[in-house]
Design a protein with these regions (language model features):
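N-terminal amphipathic, basic-rich helices that act as targeting or association modules
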Residues: 1-33
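Structured, non-catalytic alpha/beta "coupling" segments that mediate domain-domain communication
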Residues: 29-52
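Single conserved hydrophobic/aromatic residue that forms the stacking wall/gate
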Residues: 159-169
Length: 169
């Protein structure tokens, strides 16, 4: 989305276009997984801090989203912070699956997305369910850790981070 200009200040684009671009350039394993991920990243009941700004029927906890040809999206302002500096050689790139283009090995991310949005998924013989934490509390903890020279476990116990927030469908 970043490469094609579907950014927070730009126009919304059909989700089918986004899915096609992702499938063609980065993930050739089917559109259902890609669209499902795009939808979840725009649902405020699935993601604590949405990374996609949705337009159209992205579903409810009880009902599925409309087909990708009827929905539109663009990056949220928060998601642009995950890519800030990507054009400034801040991360390494590697060839994509076909070798036609490159993709970042990691995102330069200005915030810890895994901690604030959590993660859940299933793979072969494994499952994970990491609930999200509060962005402000995580930010304060990171700032404290960066300011404190050689922090000890006792110092880290002074940081207040509430229990993770559990998502409820």
């Amino acid at each position: 989305m970043y490469e094609t200009g579907i950014r927070p200040t730009g126009p919304f684009r059909k989700c089918s276009k986004v899915v096609g671009d992702v499938m063609g350039n980065y993930h050739p394993h089917g559109n259902d997984a890609i669209y499902g991920t795009l939808v979840r990243l725009g649902q405020n009941f699935s993601t604590r801090y949405p990374l996609i700004e949705p337009q159209g029927n992205f579903g409810t906890p009880d009902d599925p989203p409309a087909a990708m040809r009827y929905t539109e999206s663009r990056m949220s302002s928060l998601s642009s912070q995950l890519l800030d500096g990507i054009d400034e050689e801040t991360v390494d790139f590697e060839p994509n699956y076909s070798g036609e283009t490159t993709e970042p090995k990691v995102l330069p991310g200005r915030f810890p997305n895994l901690l604030i949005n959590g993660a859940e998924g299933i793979a072969v013989a494994m499952a994970t369910n990491m609930p999200p934490y509060n962005l402000k509390e995580i930010t304060e903890a990171v700032k404290f850790t960066l300011k404190t020279k050689d922090p000890k476990p006792k110092d880290l116990s002074l940081i207040h981070i509430s229990e993770p927030t559990r998502r409820t469908p």
